[in-house]
Amino acid sequence: VQNLYQKEFLLAQLEYDNKQTRADRKIGDYFNHISKDSKHDLACELIIELGDMDFWNDKTMDYKKQMTEVYKDQIYKLMEVVPDFKVANAVVHYDETSPHMHLVGIPVKDGYKNGMKKQVAKSKIFTKESLKTLQDKMRAYCIEKFNEVYVQNATLKKKQKGRNKDIHVNEMDGY
């Protein structure tokens, strides 16, 4: 994540700092600056899962590992759907109830008039509407790739309300 911050924000941070006449207004390291800021999240985590414990319970590890191809495709689809979410890391877990992928990334917004021109911007990138669109598109892409990899014609269960949560890092015990 720290390397991605350098890649995404260094030029904007240097431009901003060079315009500052007072040393106390200079940001220096944007990663450290945001990590000390209680108003912004340093990064966001998305979890992509297809199927539940009942579906995966009797499947072999080889069968489960075929999901790697499905999840790799999901990374590229996510970058198409949300180009302002820059993926720093993606890990697939096979050791729990069902194979699922954790993605960690930074929501980046360009074109700010105040402060740095480019900033971390979770609330601008992930709105209620954009999250609904994201989930709908990713569900369609995921089942399409699943059917291609597993040579099936499976369908998804209807979406359940209340399953998505925005969890602050301080509340993540047990996740």
Report each predicted region and the residues it spans.
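N-terminal nicking endonuclease/strand-transfer module with a His-rich metal-binding environment
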Residues: 1-175
